[in-house]
Curated annotation (Swiss-Prot):
Gene: yosI
Name of the protein described by the UniProt record: SPbeta prophage-derived uncharacterized protein YosI
Species of origin: Bacillus subtilis (strain 168)
Organism lineage: Bacteria, Bacillati, Bacillota, Bacilli, Bacillales
Amino acid sequence: MKMKYGLYCMGSLVNTYDDAIEAHNDAVYAQEESGVPHEVREIQ
């Protein structure tokens, strides 16, 4: 089963990804730009 990953900001799903590395890179970029913590979680 292929995993999906969600990018979350303040508990809200912002975007979904098929690739964990891409999701992580976007989370780092979004956090640097906004100053607000973002996180990546697996979606089941």
